[in-house]
Structures are given as structure tokens and as C-alpha cells.
Amino acid sequence: MRKKLVAGNWKMHGSLAENAALLAALKPALQGIEAAVCVPFPYLAQVQTALAGSSLAWGAQNVSEHGKGAFTGEVSASMLLDFGCKYVIVGHSERRSLYGESDALVAAKYMAAQAAGLTPILCVGESLAERESGVTEQVVARQLDAVVAAAGIASLARAVVAYEPVWAIGTGKTASPEQAQAVHAFIRGKLADLDAAVAAGLIIQYGGSVKAANAAELMAQPDIDGGLIGGASLLADEFVAICRAAAK
């Protein structure tokens, strides 16, 4: 039986005061529930201190493909490990679209994260134009293939995949539970052709305007194993409700 994992992606939000209040609300409410928050780099030390000894894990939203060196402004996987990170998001649609990250670069970041002992949350998903053109499966397959070709199918036993239809991120539009399940089933089936055991054990999160009101219906789908939560992860009551829906 696969466990479910809900991870909050704070994106470029937060302040020391806001974070302290949010974490203070989340920590007791989520005791014993597997969940995580992926926070901006400057707040990793704060989160490490605040969440020490709790069941909440934490991580980052991006990582360099390089181990160390003259790469001004970059942050390496080993640095994230120093701050107690368990997870790091790679290939988020905002990184792919706004910063031009290619499938090859995402694969390199994924491998750098794993080499340091982090669990990458690999994001895949299609745009509205791609969905309307009927190429959702081809797009998702291409994004997965880049990682499998570079790191091998066995590497996915130490990773999480998040399916995020780009057209549903921050738009208020949500893929219907059936639409989401269809893509999750495609992902698992595609990977099962390469390694059935890895595919069966893989956590595949859904990301895209998940909120308390729709979480239970999404989490009830057989191949949806939690969520990668954006805006709702900044609201304690919403995030707790989503985590509890996944834990049922």
C-alpha cells in the first residue's frame, strides 16, 4: 500500500513573522501525519529550527545541477542537506516556463539532488494548449523519459513525481478527479512497462489548485498519492484539511 504525501510549495511568499505563525499552527495539527513544506532558501534555517522533532519534513523549491564551484547565486544539494532538507522540487512548471529550464537541465538537477541524499519531487505536466491539442501524454512522457534516460528507472524508487497540469496552477481551475486520475494512471502504467515494482511504489502527487473543498475527491482516486500544494499551503486551516484528507 502506497503512503500519501502532501507537500506545500510556498513559492516566493513568506516573512519571518508570517512563517513563525504558520509553522506554529501546522506543527501540532499535523502531528503524526506525513507532510512537508518547501520554502524559499532564506527561511530554511528558521524552518529547520521550528520543525525539529516534528513529523513535518521540509525542503527547497530548486537546486543547482552543480555540486559546488563558481556559480554565483546558485545553491547546491549538499547545502540544502546542511539545513535538514528531505525534499527538493525540480522541474516545476514555473521554472520550466519562466526560466527556460529544459528537460535535460531538470534531469541534471534531479540527479544532483539524489547524489546528495535528497528526495527530488519531479514535476511534470502540460499547458492548456497542449491539453487542447490532445498531446498531454506525449508531453508528460517526454518529461519523464529525460529523467529515466539520465538517471535510470530504479532512481524513481528514491523520488516523488508530481503531476501538475500547468493550466490549473494558480488559476482556480482544477483538473477533474477523473482527468487527474487518467494522467496519473498513464504515468504509472508507462513506468510499469520499465519496472513494475518501482511504478507500484511510486508516490505520484497531484498539483494544481488543490484546496480543502476538492482534496477528498482528488485523494480518493486510486493513483493520486497526495498533493503538491501552492497557495493553499500558506493558509494553515486549508493545508491541514488537505493533509488530513490525504491521510484518511
UniProtKB/Swiss-Prot annotation:
Subcellular localization, as worded in the UniProt entry: Cytoplasm
Catalytic reaction(s) noted: D-glyceraldehyde 3-phosphate = dihydroxyacetone phosphate
Pathway: Carbohydrate biosynthesis; gluconeogenesis; Carbohydrate degradation; glycolysis; D-glyceraldehyde 3-phosphate from glycerone phosphate: step 1/1
GO MF entry, a single one: triose-phosphate isomerase activity
Any Pfam family matching the protein: TIM
Enzyme Commission designation: 5.3.1.1
The UniProt record lists the keyword Glycoprotein: no
An example Gene Ontology CC term for this record: cytosol
Alphabetical UniProt keywords: Cytoplasm, Gluconeogenesis, Glycolysis, Isomerase
Positions annotated to bind substrate: N9, W10, K11, G170, S209, G230, G231
Keyword presence, Isomerase: yes
Active-site residues, as the UniProt record annotates them: H92 (electrophile), E164 (proton acceptor)
SUPFAM superfamilies for this protein: Triosephosphate isomerase (TIM)
GO biological process, one term: glycolytic process
Location, primary (coarse class): cytoplasm
Group of enzyme by EC: isomerase
Entry coiled-coil feature ranges: none
Role description: Involved in the gluconeogenesis. Catalyzes stereospecifically the conversion of dihydroxyacetone phosphate (DHAP) to D-glyceraldehyde-3-phosphate (G3P).
Subunit composition and interactions: Homodimer.
Family recorded in the similarity comment: Belongs to the triosephosphate isomerase family.
The name this protein goes by in its record: Triosephosphate isomerase
Species of origin: Thiobacillus denitrificans (strain ATCC 25259 / T1)
